[in-house]
Every structure is written in C-alpha cells, then in structure tokens.
Amino acid sequence: GTGGEFQPLGITKNKGVLNIDVTGLDAEYASSAGVLTAAFPNYLVASVLKNNVYADGLGFVFNTSVEQFFKSLRDNVGSFIFAKEMNDNGTLVGYPYRTTNLLETTGGKSSIIFGNWNDLVIGEQGALEIETSREGSWTDDAGNLISAFENDQTLIRAINNVDTGLRHDESFAVATKVAVPV
C-alpha cells in the first residue's frame, strides 16, 4: 500500500529499506536480465548483516517461482546447489525461508525479501469492533438472498484494524527485478 490511511506501507515500498535492483549488479551475482547466480543469496544476506542487525530472526521470503529457481540451480558438474538444503531443512544458505505468492511475478520478474523478521511490528488500532444487524441480508453459496429479518436472525460482523511497521528499516533488504521462470 501507500502507507496512507487504511493502507499499510509494508516492507517493499518502505523508503528506508535497502532496495537492490538485481539487473544493475555485478555479473558475479546476477545478469543484466535479472537472472541470479548461486552467489546472490549470500550477497543479499551480507547487505543486511553489514548493518549490525541482530541475527535472531533472519530469513528470506520469496514466491514459489523463486523457490523453484533456486532449487534448480546447478554447479559446473551438474549437481544441484541448493535443492537438498531447501528440501531437507527449509533453509537457503543457512537461513529459513517462507514462500508466498503475494510477492507476485509480473512480466517474468519478482522480488526477494531478506531481513530480521523480529523487527517487523504488527499493531492493532483500537479495540475489536462488533457490529450487529437484524435487517441485513447475505447471499448463500447457492446464490440465494437470505434475509436476517425474515429468518429471525442477527448478523454479526467483527472488525479489527491491523497495520505493520518496521522497528529498524535497515534490518531488511528487498531484491527487485529478479528473473524467474513463469
């Protein structure tokens, strides 16, 4: 989001977070098309650790296309570089990772986030709001309009306003324009 009212800023749009355009990196880490090398994960880790970040909650987040890309990387003799570690331990270069397709692949490009997830703060605004209605209606799974009034029912809706923020912006880095198989 934009960070405005009712739109969390999140990590990827936070101006204080290191943003790494992988298409501009040295060829040791990525090609100009954004195809990563096996050295890139350690580069991303080092870009965060150089900020003296606590190492108690470090990890990666990327989408499933990035995960499959890393699992398919091979060395010069054809052996998989990361597949065993990722499959057996759920780690990449020794750090845990999680996948989510909320980090989209658009035009064959995606993003990778690395950071100290203990520095991600989740906050609630106010208390849980409860609203009730005896006059409301809803549509059931079959497409029928159901009236609460006609069925002597009360509809209940719970609303909880939640936002995220970073305790230390320097605890995160976002790699962008990462080329992945679509």
Language-model segments: which ranges?
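Surface-exposed acidic, glycine-flexible loop patches that form ligand/cofactor-binding
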Residues: 49-53
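Sequence/fold signature of self-assembling virion shell proteins
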Residues: 28, 36, 74-182
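Generic detector of multi-pass transmembrane helix bundles and their immediately adjacent loops
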Residues: 60-69, 97
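Generic recognition of stable, solvent-exposed alpha-helical segments in well-folded globular domains
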Residues: 36-43, 61, 65, 151, ...
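Short, catalytically relevant binding-site loops at active-site mouths
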Residues: 11-16, 66-68, 103-105
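Alpha-helical scaffold segments that mediate packing/assembly in large oligomeric complexes
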Residues: 1-47, 179-182
